[in-house]
């Protein structure tokens, strides 16, 4: 051994003696051989008995409280990240009491799109609440039974079956081996290898069947022929028309959760999606006092997740896992009863706290469910006697605990020690008393808050004692005591709740990165002494989740104490049976929409219904609020704005107003705000948590995969019980956002699913590119308004699939590509703005030509008024919304996002030159004002039409004979009455007699200039109409009520008058 440098003891390997040769004569000692290559390390010996816990390192001073981050702008809600695989399950709580089922709120009707309000200012972002200490994971209540599956909508008609593909040509049969001699006479010759099968020859006469001879030996089987090539697949039959989606089944009652599957290794934590718009932050419940730090018992069965109950008091503080991203708040399940804590193992070293996960974006604040009844608080078991320790194998000599090194900058989390072999899991004992606290080492310096410092260097391990020989594996030692958690940094101040902004569109969630596998647990750091438990606050009523403030900087991690040996894990206690899942309470009222967040990327829209033909766009009505968005994927950037018809809401569009006679051209309404993508549909029920598997080593953070296509949303199941949150894995990098899907009709706001463990929010994909704003075309003369096309049928709301059970959080699929951003849901296609009719007499401005966008502008009556707006540049054509995909099942409809912003209003093209105003034709009646199309931007005022002639004021008729003058007042100096006949000499003013008869009227004086028209006196008899100006061809509808318009000079006004 020595010559090979292999020390069996230290290597722990097993030397395998070779057979001894006979001893030769003793030679003289040769020169010492060079040391041989180092032997490989033998397999690790059985773990020795756990050494005594090393002295506990001092509790690091609490890091400075994280500052509240500035309120961020409300991010667009990220697309909900795909749910990462559930982290390892925390201890399962005893089943919480199921809350009473809330009544299901009605799905509100989608209102017609209201006019888009201006976006309110984004509410201030609430200060981020400081992350509370992570309570020990409550034990998860039993999973409720899976809800019944909603009835599937009626199946659409089956698509035609595709033709079967042609059968591939059969390959030539392999040669058959020679047949054994046939038993019958007329020996059939051995069958030659079959060539490609020739035409079948005519069958020879059958020989007489001889008596069967003894069977000949079977010929060798010929090689198998090649399989024929597969035929081309037949053409796929046409898809049948999508069936009408059945009404979404009601979410069935939640079925019992299946056993919890092993937790997948946590994937890397996905990047956090952009923060959603902050919901209004409800009042924060009082912060419960942290319960005493129990030893973390084996995970109890997962409690059912009820509605979000009041915030349970924090369970004993477990070691802080890396903070997961904050998922959208689900309803908080009833707090499970506290599971019985298992015996406390010796304290492991405290691992350095993982880095805080990126802050997840808060989903839109769910309507707070009615608070479920708080589950009864599980009894905290009296500390039971520790379950029997498994037999400990013969202890290897305990390595000496290294003295804790001075806390270095917290180091990276050390490699996980080799995980001891788990002993059989003892039944979960009642929580043993906490182990004595190790003597605290000197306090580590307070690290700066913020990133997890690197774990301090671990003091040098004492020399390892020689490894004991590998004992039989003893039963696992009792689990080390869980180190006391380091003090939590003081919580950052809770952010004030921002007003709830209107949630921006959900960003497309990036795909959550794959959750890395969980590394072997590092040795548990010595826990710092638990902070004193604060008094347990009563549960506050659950507020709406406020916007999640930015996470405060993480306090500095305490220094990592020297690792105690990790005890073997005790047996896992049996999971409690899942209690029934309470019905999901009604969704609470939706918080007020705050100001709209910025438009996030458009969520994926549900499939767009096929656009109806657009009617001629009336004036654009104000956009109504968008219908609830289906869970929108990332909302694609608004596609090029097609010519807007009246924009139908995407999805179920409100019916476009009929185009009336073209009203006057309205100002374009603002486009409605883009609806935010609805909140993610309720999470499907979480699959039953399997037993917690050992955590694998953390995998590398997966690359962000490309997003998969968004799956159809299943029917929302009842929300599955959320398994206890495992530590959040690191979020994977966000996948690239897929293109935004088409915006489907917004589904009704789904009930807020229970908050899952917050999944890692995938990073939002970048919003799809905004469609280009078409440049405004010139306004053509308005054509006659096209008839409004029928409103496109909103795609049917796909059936909301039942949410499948919440599988383990798989690695988040890459977010599917968001569908391409649908172009803005189809406004029905606006009919092309009919070609501008010939400009009639400048009465109406013909409906503006193609700017199909604007409804036909009402008649712009008199000429010159806005020239007909040129066609608004094409809003890029609304691309064909692809044929509406089969409506995917819309995800559970998200809440109605704020109305999406309208795409940019195309600029109104320059108004075409107004035709010369003729005398205004008679103003045709103004058509009823069509719905106000978007007002394209007002086209440039066309050239004023020529001012029609002011019709001639009719010739002034000869002045009528003057009425008899009233009595003359005392005569002032009478002005010359036109030249009156020469005044007689004014006698002394007589009484006011009648004036002498007026002399015959003098010839009319020259026509004074027409004074401003005073009030029109009673019209004299109209003079003969002046000659009409040149016809403008438009009809004058000016006598109809018109919206005020900037009027061009109405040349016909005088004429009319």
Swiss-Prot record:
The modification 4-hydroxyproline is found at residues 29, 32, 35, 44, 47, 50, 65, 80, 86, 95, 101, 128, 131, 137, 146, 152, 173, 182, 185, 212, 215, 227, 233, 242, 248, 251, 266, 275, 278, 290, 292, 299, 314, 320, 323, 329, 335, 353, 362, 368, 374, 383, 386, 395, 404, 410, 422, 431, 440, 443, 461, 479, 485, 491, 497, 503, 509, 521, 530, 542, 554, 557, 563, 569, 578, 596, 611, 617, 638, 644, 647, 656, 662, 680, 689, 698, 710, 716, 725, 734, 737, 758, 764, 767, 776, 785, 803, 812, 815, 821, 836, 842, 848, 857, 863, 869, 884, 887, 890, 959, 962, 965, 983, 998, 1001, 1004, 1019, 1022, 1025, 1028, 1031. Contains mostly 4-hydroxyproline. Proline residues at the third position of the tripeptide repeating unit (G-X-Y) are hydroxylated in some or all of the chains. Residues 324-333, 789-798 have a biased composition (Gly residues). The modification 5-hydroxylysine is found at residues 104, 269, 344, 590, 701, 872, 935, 947. Residues 18-1031 are annotated as: Triple-helical region. The modification 3-hydroxyproline is found at residues 724, 1003, 1018, 1021, 1024. Residues 172-184, 835-845, 881-896, 1016-1031 have a biased composition (Pro residues). It is found in: Secreted, Extracellular space, Extracellular matrix. The keyword Secreted applies. Glycans are attached at residues 104, 947. Residues 18-76, 75-134, 135-193, 195-252, 522-579, 555-613, 618-676, 678-736, 804-861, 918-976, 972-1030 form the Collagen-like domain. Residues 1-10, 68-82, 932-946, 1046-1057 have a biased composition (Basic and acidic residues). InterPro entries: Collagen, Collagen_Structural_Proteins. Residues 37-56, 118-134, 157-170, 218-269, 287-296, 377-403, 412-431, 473-500, 539-566, 623-637, 650-677, 706-722, 751-760, 770-785, 917-931, 965-997 have a biased composition (Low complexity). The modification Pyrrolidone carboxylic acid is found at residue 1. PANTHER family: COLLAGEN ALPHA-1(XXIII) CHAIN-LIKE ISOFORM X2 (PTHR37456:SF6), SI:CH211-266K2.1 (PTHR37456). This is Collagen alpha-1(I) chain. It comes from Mammut americanum (American mastodon). The lineage of its organism: Eukaryota, Metazoa, Chordata, Craniata, Vertebrata.
């Amino acid at each position: 051994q020595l010559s090979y440098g292999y020390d069996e003891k230290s290597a722990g390997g097993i030397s395998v003696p070779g057979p001894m040769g006979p001893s030769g004569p003793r030679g003289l000692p040769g020169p010492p051989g060079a040391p041989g290559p180092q032997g490989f390390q033998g397999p690790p010996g059985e773990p020795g008995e756990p050494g005594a816990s090393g002295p506990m390192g001092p509790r690091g001073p609490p890091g400075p409280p994280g500052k509240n981050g500035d309120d961020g702008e409300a991010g667009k809600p990220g697309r909900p990240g795909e749910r990462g695989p559930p982290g390892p399950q925390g201890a399962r709580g005893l089943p919480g009491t199921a809350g009473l089922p809330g009544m299901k709120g009605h799905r509100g009707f989608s209102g017609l799109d209201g006019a888009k309000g201006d976006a309110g200012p984004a509410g201030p972002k609430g200060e981020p609440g400081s992350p509370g200490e992570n309570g020990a994971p409550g034990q998860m209540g039993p999973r409720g039974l899976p809800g019944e599956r909603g009835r599937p909508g009626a199946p659409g008609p089956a698509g035609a079956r595709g033709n079967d593909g042609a059968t591939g040509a059969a390959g030539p049969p392999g040669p058959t081996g020679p047949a054994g001699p046939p038993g019958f006479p007329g020996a059939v010759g051995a069958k030659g290898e079959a060539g490609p099968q020739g035409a079948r020859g005519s069958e020879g006469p059958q020989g007489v069947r001889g008596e069967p001879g003894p069977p000949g030996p079977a010929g060798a089987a010929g090689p198998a022929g090649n399989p024929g090539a597969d035929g081309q697949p037949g053409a796929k039959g046409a898809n049948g028309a999508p069936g009408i989606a059945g009404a979404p089944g009601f979410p069935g009652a939640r079925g019992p959760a299946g056993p919890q599957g092993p937790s997948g290794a946590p994937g890397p934590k996905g990047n956090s999606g952009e923060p959603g718009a902050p919901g209004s932050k409800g009042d924060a419940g009082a912060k419960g006092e942290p319960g005493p730090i129990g030893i973390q018992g084996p995970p109890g069965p997962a409690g059912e997740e009820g509605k979000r109950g009041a915030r349970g008091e924090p369970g004993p503080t477990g070691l802080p896992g890396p903070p997961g991203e904050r998922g959208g708040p689900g309803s908080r399940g009833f707090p499970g009863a506290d599971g019985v804590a298992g015996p406390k193992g010796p304290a492991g070293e405290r691992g350095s706290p993982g880095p805080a996960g990126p802050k997840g974006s808060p989903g839109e604040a769910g309507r707070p469910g009615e608070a479920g009844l708080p589950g009864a608080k599980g009894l905290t078991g009296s500390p039971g006697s520790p379950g029997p320790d498994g037999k400990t194998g013969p202890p290897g000599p305990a390595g000496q605990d290294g003295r804790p090194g001075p806390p270095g900058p917290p180091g990276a989390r050390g490699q996980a020690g080799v995980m001891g072999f788990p002993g059989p899991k003892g039944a979960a004992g009642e929580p043993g008393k906490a182990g004595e606290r190790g003597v605290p080492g000197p306090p580590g310096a307070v690290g700066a808050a913020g990133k997890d410092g690197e774990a301090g260097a671990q003091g040098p391990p004492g020399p390892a004692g020689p490894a004991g020989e590998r004992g039989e594996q003893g039963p696992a030692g009792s689990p080390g005591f869980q180190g006391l958690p380091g003090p939590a940094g003081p919580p950052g101040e809770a952010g004030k709740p921002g007003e709830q902004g209107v949630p921006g569109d959900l960003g497309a969630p990036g795909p959550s990165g794959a959750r890395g596998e969980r590394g072997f647990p590092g040795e548990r750091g010595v826990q710092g002494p638990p902070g004193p438990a604060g008094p347990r606050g009563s549960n506050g009523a659950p507020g709406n989740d406020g916007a999640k403030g930015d996470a405060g900087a993480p306090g500095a991690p305490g220094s990592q104490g020297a690792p105690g040996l990790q005890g073997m894990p005790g047996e896992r206690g049996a999971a409690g049976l899942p209690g029934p899942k309470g019905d999901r309470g009604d969704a609470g009222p939706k918080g007020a929409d705050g100001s709209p967040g910025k438009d996030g990327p458009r969520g994926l829209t549900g499939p767009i219904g096929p656009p109806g033909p657009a009617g001629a766009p009336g004036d654009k009505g104000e956009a109504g609020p968008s219908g609830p968005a289906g869970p929108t994927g990332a909302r694609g950037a608004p596609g090029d704005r097609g010519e807007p018809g009246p924009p139908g809401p995407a999805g179920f569009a409100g019916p476009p107003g009929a185009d009336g006679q073209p009203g006057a051209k309205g100002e374009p309404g603002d486009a409605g705000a883009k609806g935010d993508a609805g909140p993610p549909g309720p999470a499907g029920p979480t699959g039953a948590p399997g037993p917690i598997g050992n955590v694998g080593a953390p995998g590398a953070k997966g690359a962000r995969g490309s997003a998969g296509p968004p799956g159809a949303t299943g029917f929302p199941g009842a929300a599955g019980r959320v398994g206890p949150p495992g530590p959040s894995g690191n979020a994977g990098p966000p996948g690239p956002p897929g293109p935004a899907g088409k915006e489907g009709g917004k589904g009704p706001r789904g009930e807020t699913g229970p908050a899952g463990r917050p999944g890692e929010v995938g990073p939002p994909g970048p919003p799809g590119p905004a469609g280009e704003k078409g440049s405004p075309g010139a306004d053509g003369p308005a054509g006659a308004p096209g008839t409004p096309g029928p409103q496109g049928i909103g795609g049917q709301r796909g059936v909301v699939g039942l949410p499948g059970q919440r599988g383990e959080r798989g690695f988040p699929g890459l977010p599917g590509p968001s569908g391409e951003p649908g172009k803005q849901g189809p406004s029905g296609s606006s009919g092309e703005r009919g070609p501008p009719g010939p400009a009639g007499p400048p009465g109406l401005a013909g409906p503006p030509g193609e700017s199909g966008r604007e409804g036909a502008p009402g008649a712009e009556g008199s000429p010159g008024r806005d020239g007909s707006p040129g066609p608004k540049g094409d809003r890029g054509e609304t691309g064909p919304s692809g044929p509406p995909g089969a409506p995917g099942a819309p995800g559970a409809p998200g809440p109605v996002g704020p109305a999406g912003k309208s795409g940019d209003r195309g600029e109104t093209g320059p108004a075409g030159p107004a035709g010369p105003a003729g005398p205004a034709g008679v103003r045709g009646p103004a058509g009823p004002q069509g719905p106000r199309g978007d007002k394209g931007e007002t086209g440039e005022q066309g050239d004023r039409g020529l001012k029609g002639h002011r019709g001639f004021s009719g010739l002034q008729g000869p002045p009528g004979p003057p009425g008899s003058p009233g009595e003359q007042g005392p005569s002032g100096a009478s002005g010359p009455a036109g030249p009156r006949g020469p005044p007689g000499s004014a006698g002394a003013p007589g009484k006011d007699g009648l004036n002498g008869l007026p002399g015959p009227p003098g010839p009319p004086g020259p026509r004074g200039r027409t004074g401003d028209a005073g009030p029109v006196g009673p019209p004299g008899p109209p003079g003969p109409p002046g000659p009409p100006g040149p016809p403008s061809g438009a009809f004058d509808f000016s006598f109809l009520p018109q919206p005020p318009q900037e009027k061009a000079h109405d040349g016909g006004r005088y004429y009319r008058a």
